[in-house]
């Protein structure tokens, strides 16, 4: 965590307009420098200078889709770690087709999604309405399919949920940190995508990257727990959100080690 803050990685984000400010703030709080660019005249230049790339498909439109594809291909060519957040991929054919195309041609380093989103990518039926997932358990059969998916594509898959699941096809981990209130705040999953991009941006070594990804997932959950513990009587979700971002800006390795609930498989 401290090393990330000293390095201040530059993170290029092509994201949705619902959570764009929150993603920028989370990136700053976790020690990075956010930059959002979609104009084709500057896209190549900015992507090449970045330490990490995040593509979030929450609010798709044609120009953004083209920008996302251009940036992802540049990241692939230059060896820049990239994260794809296929928000609501289960909701429409457009999202499914675009996600499959950018995964095939852009080869992201990591895919992060809730269980409904990830099940859609691996070809399973999901329980959802719109972009909201109502999946609450991850079967061993689905776990094995996710591992195979990650291994075949040489990437990390992060499945967010009550228990988060992370795998690169060879190593896997479950994280039990977090609180139900995080699911009631718009964009906590998107914000996790920013943290994961930061986690990847520091290390070149695959094993170190995997451990840093697991740490980022656990850290975000711990921040949620601490944010909830700070709530007073009659303080609701907006105070919780403020506390969540606040905790991310002050959390340290000692607190993470004391509170992390990680099981490696």
UniProtKB/Swiss-Prot annotation:
It catalyses: 5-(2-hydroxyethyl)-4-methylthiazole + ATP = 4-methyl-5-(2-phosphooxyethyl)-thiazole + ADP + H(+). Keywords: ATP-binding, Kinase, Magnesium, Metal-binding, Nucleotide-binding, Thiamine biosynthesis, Transferase. GO terms for molecular function: ATP binding; hydroxyethylthiazole kinase activity; magnesium ion binding. It holds the Pfam family HK. The keyword Transport does not apply. InterPro entries: Hyethyz_kinase, Ribokinase-like. ATP binds at residues 112, 160. Pathway: Cofactor biosynthesis; thiamine diphosphate biosynthesis; 4-methyl-5-(2-phosphoethyl)-thiazole from 5-(2-hydroxyethyl)-4-methylthiazole: step 1/1. One of its GO terms (biological process) is thiamine diphosphate biosynthetic process. Belongs to the Thz kinase family. NCBIfam families: PRK09355.1. This is Hydroxyethylthiazole kinase. It comes from Clostridium perfringens (strain 13 / Type A).
């Amino acid at each position: 965590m401290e090393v990330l803050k000293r390095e201040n990685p530059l993170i290029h984000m092509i994201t949705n307009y619902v959570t764009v400010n929150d993603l920028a703030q989370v990136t700053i709080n976790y020690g990075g420098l956010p930059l959002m660019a979609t104009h084709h005249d500057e896209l190549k230049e900015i992507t090449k200078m970045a330490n990490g790339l995040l593509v979030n498909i929450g609010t798709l439109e044609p120009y953004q889709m083209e920008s996302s594809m251009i940036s992802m291909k540049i990241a692939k060519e230059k060896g820049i770690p990239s994260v794809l957040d296929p928000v609501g991929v289960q909701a429409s054919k457009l999202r499914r087709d675009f996600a499959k195309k950018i995964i095939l041609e852009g080869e992201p380093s990591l895919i992060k999604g809730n269980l409904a989103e990830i099940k859609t990518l691996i070809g399973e039926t999901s329980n959802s309405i719109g972009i909201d997932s109502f999946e609450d358990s991850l079967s061993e059969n689905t776990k094995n399919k996710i591992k195979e998916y990650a291994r075949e594509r040489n990437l990390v898959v992060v499945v967010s949920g009550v228990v988060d699941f992370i795998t690169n096809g060879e190593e896997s981990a479950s994280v039990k940190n977090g609180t139900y209130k995080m699911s009631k705040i718009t964009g906590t999953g998107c914000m996790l995508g920013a943290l994961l991009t930061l986690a990847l941006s520091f290390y070149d070594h695959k094993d170190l990257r995997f451990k840093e990804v697991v740490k980022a997932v656990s850290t975000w959950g711990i921040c949620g727990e601490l944010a909830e513990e700070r709530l007073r009587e009659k303080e609701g979700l907006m105070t919780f959100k403020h506390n969540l971002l606040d905790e991310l800006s002050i959390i340290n390795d000692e607190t993470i080690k004391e509170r992390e609930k990680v099981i490696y498989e």
